[in-house]
Amino acid sequence: MTRKKMNPFVAHHLLAKIEKVNMKEEKETIVTWSRASSILPTMVGHTIAIHNGKEHIPIYITNPMVGRKLGEFVPTRHFTSYENARKDTKSRR
């Protein structure tokens, strides 16, 4: 079965948190570890803190993000440049 025919995946606990915040009509940060969840139109306007493996990164959800996954907006790997090692010529002497 192709993915287009299936409903988008959203973790139940995340969906419950979104509905609870929508009922309160308050703005608060929602913390989640579910990077595989799809962004639904009900999430637009909320700030969701998504786990990147080390910490939670807050992301404000906008309309162009609908239909994509939460994990796409939080990188898990950071490239460390080797320029600092090259500039340190005193340690080579």
UniProtKB/Swiss-Prot annotation:
Which UniProt key words apply to this protein? Chloroplast, Plastid, Ribonucleoprotein, Ribosomal protein, RNA-binding, rRNA-binding
InterPro entries per the UniProt record, alphabetical: Ribosomal_uS19, Ribosomal_uS19_bac-type, Ribosomal_uS19_CS, Ribosomal_uS19_SF
The primary location reported for this protein is plastid
Keyword Flavoprotein found: no
Where is it located? Plastid, Chloroplast
GO annotation (BP), single: translation
Provide any one GO MF term from the record.
rRNA binding
One GO CC term, this protein: mitochondrial small ribosomal subunit
Q: Does the keyword Membrane apply?
A: no
Its function?
Protein S19 forms a complex with S13 that binds strongly to the 16S ribosomal RNA.
The family classification in the record reads: Belongs to the universal ribosomal protein uS19 family.
Q: What is this protein called?
A: Small ribosomal subunit protein uS19c
Organism, per UniProt? Lolium perenne (Perennial ryegrass)
Classification lineage:
Eukaryota, Viridiplantae, Streptophyta, Embryophyta, Tracheophyta
